């Protein structure tokens, strides 16, 4: 049972509840700040409040905000990529039932993994598996290899269609 405060934040659209796309609600539930203003505020303002109050923000901005901005934008970029796939859903190789993310444990490596985008099929065992990278650097084939490894850990489908989104482009 969630607290009344968390429920209120969810009702206001400030917080959202996420579970891995193919899982039933339970232990793997996480709560995220959905509202971009609140995400920015709580990511950058409290930790830099002294610099802001004393007028030094312009001087420390490159290290305090700019250096961490790509990490901050990652969640927003993931949403944009999901929206892109939904917009072009009719031209995708499968008919989507839903789209979300998935996380779990790679038992071979004993580490947590996350797949940014998983599209579940209306029929069959074909899934969309996607990665979203909001970085200035170009990404290479190693990202596809990693995504294929993650798909094998996900293990729900018999066939996967891979989509990789990159702000910086590809090598």
Regions picked out by a protein language model, each given a short descriptive name:
Residues 1-13:
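Short amphipathic alpha-helical interaction segments
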Residues 2, 16-18, 104:
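Glycine-rich, charged/polar anion/phosphate-binding loops
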Residues 10-22:
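A short, conserved structural fragment
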Residues 21, 29-171:
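A cross-kingdom feature that marks ATP-driven nucleic-acid transaction machinery
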């Amino acid at each position: 049972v969630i607290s009344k405060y968390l429920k209120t934040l969810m009702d206001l659209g400030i917080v959202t509840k996420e579970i891995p796309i193919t899982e039933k609600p339970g232990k793997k539930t996480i709560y995220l700040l959905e509202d971009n203003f609140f995400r920015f505020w709580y990511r950058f303002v409290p930790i830099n409040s002294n610099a802001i109050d004393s007028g030094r923000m312009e001087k420390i901005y490159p290290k305090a905000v700019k250096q961490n901005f790509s990490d901050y934008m990652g969640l927003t970029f993931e949403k944009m990529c999901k929206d892109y796939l939904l917009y072009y859903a009719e031209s995708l190789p499968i008919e989507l039932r839903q789209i979300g993310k998935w996380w779990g444990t790679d038992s071979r490596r004993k580490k947590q993994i996350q797949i940014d985008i998983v599209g579940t099929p209306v029929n069959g065992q074909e899934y969309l598996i996607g990665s979203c990278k909001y970085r200035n650097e170009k990404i290479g084939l190693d990202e596809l290899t990693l995504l294929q490894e993650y798909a094998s850990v996900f293990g729900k489908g018999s066939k996967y269609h891979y989509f990789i989104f990159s702000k910086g482009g590809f090598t």
